[in-house]
Each structure stands twice: as structure tokens, then as C-alpha cells.
Amino acid sequence: MRKAYCLFIFSFVYSISFAQNVAVINGKPVNTKEFLWAYKKSHNGNTPTDYEKLQAYLNLYINFKLKVLDAREMGLDKNTEYQEEIKTYESNLVARKKAGGNKDYDYLLNEYREGVLMFNVSEQKIWDKAQSDEAALYDFYSRNKQKYSKAFNEVRGDVIADYQLSLEEKWLNSLKQKYQVKINDNELKKLTKL
């Protein structure tokens, strides 16, 4: 009886804490307020009204968070240049906060930190690889030759772009296998009613 009671209490507490998040990625919650702030920022301050659009944006946001998680696991957040860049940005943000009283300070700083990490890890895993591995690039062209109507050297730019998309898709699929992602549809639906 005691175990059942403890299990009930644990389940209740978990459901309450989960309800304040739109998702959980590898045990780390994606806070509803942070997600809504990011959504509004990228949608000219508009509040979400369409569930499908909100769900599509959440999927993009989760992909972003997965890349950031991978960057942290690789130790990119420990890089001296990264830390110096963040300190410089934070100093500038503090100066603006004192001047203008920015209420979104924490969100802006976190967005910048994560954005730089996402850029750095994408550069390593996608962009540099597509630019420097000529054999892999040509192999990709050969396997998808029916898509291109011209010789490799004439469509190299298109091949690089397509190869980068392919690398990103494979990378995201591997991240989704590696890290557990749980979406809270009930919380997401509530956001369309705000």
C-alpha cells in the first residue's frame, strides 16, 4: 500500500511539473515560457493560434536543442574562444540592460549561448565536412545523379547544398535515437488558446 501511495504521489508531482513544459529532451525540460518567447520572437511577436504551425515550430526548436546538447556533449561549451565570445556578449547585454531595462535578458543570453554552440557544432558536423571531403561529395553526386542534369563541376554548389541537407538529416536522426524526446501535446494545445 505504501509503495502504491508513493507511486501515486510521484506520478502526480511529475505530471504537474511536465505540464509546465512543452517537451522534455534527455530529461531536461523545455520550459513553456522560453518556447513561447522564442516562437513570438521569430514570428514578429504574434501569439500562436494554429496548432500545426506551433507543432512544426516545436519540431524545429527540438532539433535546435538536440544540436546544442550534442555540442555540449562534445565539450564545445568548454572551448576558450566560445567562453570569451559569450563573456563579451554578456557584457554588452548587461550594458544595454542598464540603459534600457531589458526584461528578456536571461532568454537573450541563453539564446545567444545556444545559438553559438549550434553554429559551432553544425560547422564541424555539416558545413566543413561538405566543403572539405571531395570524395564523399562526389559519391553523393554519383548516388543522386538523376537529380542533376549537368556535370559535377557545373552543379557543385547545388550538390554541396543537398549533401549538407543529407548530413543534417542523418545527424538529427542519430540525435533522436541517442536522446529521448517527449512532447507534451496538452501544453502545446493550451498555447493555441492564449
Language model features with spans:
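Sec-dependent N-terminal signal peptides
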Residues: 4-13
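Sec/Tat signal peptide C-region and signal peptidase I cleavage site
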Residues: 15-19
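Peptidyl-prolyl cis-trans isomerase
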Residues: 20-25, 29-30, 36, 40, ...
